[in-house]
UniProtKB/Swiss-Prot annotation:
PANTHER family reported for this sequence: RIBOSOME MATURATION FACTOR RIMP
SUPFAM superfamilies named in the record: YhbC-like, N-terminal domain
A Pfam family it matches: RimP_N
The entry's keywords: Cytoplasm, Ribosome biogenesis
Gene3D superfamilies: RimP-like superfamily, N-terminal
Name by which UniProt lists this protein: Ribosome maturation factor RimP
Cell compartment(s), UniProt: Cytoplasm
Organism for this UniProt entry: Synechococcus sp. (strain WH7803)
InterPro entries linked: Ribosome_maturation_RimP, RimP_N, RimP_N_sf
Cellular-component GO terms for this entry: cytosol
Amino acid sequence: MPHPLLPDITPVAASTAAAHGFELVEIQILTHLQPMTVQVQIRRTDGSDVSLDDCAGFSGPMGEALESQALLTEAYVLEISSPGIGEQLQSDRDFQTFRSYPVEVLYRDDEGREQRQQGSLLERNADHVQVNVRGRIKRIARASVISVQLISPTG
């Protein structure tokens, strides 16, 4: 269950990220850790890589924004990162950015059984996700796709 403050904190994080040339990818509040942890994932709006210096530089403004809103009343750790390998591709931008990267597509076949297909991502259009599997193009109906996830080159 998402933390009840997430709807209040998300717009603060999104606007702070935008003001510094980033896009908010995800925010999580982990209350099972002591102190609780606020994890903020960002990516650059221009599509270039987020560096460690970017994360460190964004930590200050993000922390100040959270403090100014006084939404968190207990001690917390703020973690800034960028999405890494293993993430699920969701937006059109994700599919463009990771074209030719190794992916695993989870989908339902014609009988409704879950299937997995690994290969290099070619594209996602309105109708299909296309993956290169050892030189052959596999087209999977977009309506059948459950998820597309980046994988390491060795699988």
